[in-house]
Amino acid sequence: MSLSERDKQAVWHPYTQIKGAVDTIPIVRGEAAYLIDEEGNRYLDAISSWWVNLHGHAHPYIRQKLDEQHQKLAHVMFAGFTHESATVLCKELTTVLPKNQAKFFFSGDGSSAVEIALKMAIQYWRNKGIKKQKIIALDGGYHGETLGAMSAGAKSVFSAHFQDYLFEVTHLPFPT
């Protein structure tokens, strides 16, 4: 059974309706900016696998650094724990960013980062005792797939089915 056939039996892909799912392209590896399928066809990964692979696939330096880190520590939750790599990165960031940006919050992905930013803004004003309940975002943005991120993003075919569950956001024109 081919990879595409096995995939169709077990995987539900983003932005698809299961009954109408089409065959997927079976990617078996990546090289630099290209994805390669099981027949050796090459595809330019023009969106960096949804914007998270900006330096290409199988980059030797990144692979080396990931391997070095994985041999020391693959992961530790950040609630009550820390580790050297995170602390060093944050300290280095303080040397290149404005002085008022001296603390950093890690997130696992863009959608979660948007959710966290929304929660931080809400908590900030609540802690000050000021009742602020409006969220403002720029028109036309894509902020992710969670309900909060879809609320802040542009209304589209991706969020249409969830309109009744999204919270109110005031969208402003993008500055020119």
Positions of PLM-derived features:
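Glycine-rich loop-to-alpha-helix module at the N-terminal edge of alpha/beta enzyme cores
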Residues: 15-16, 42-130, 136
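A generic fold-level signal
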Residues: 28-30, 130, 164
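Short, acidic, Ser/Thr-enriched surface-loop or helix-capping motifs
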Residues: 37-38
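Active-site-adjacent loop/helix segments that line or gate small-molecule/cofactor pockets in enzymes
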Residues: 1-31, 48
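PLP-dependent aminotransferase-class I/II
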Residues: 140-176
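Short secondary-structure boundary/capping segments
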Residues: 25, 127, 160-163
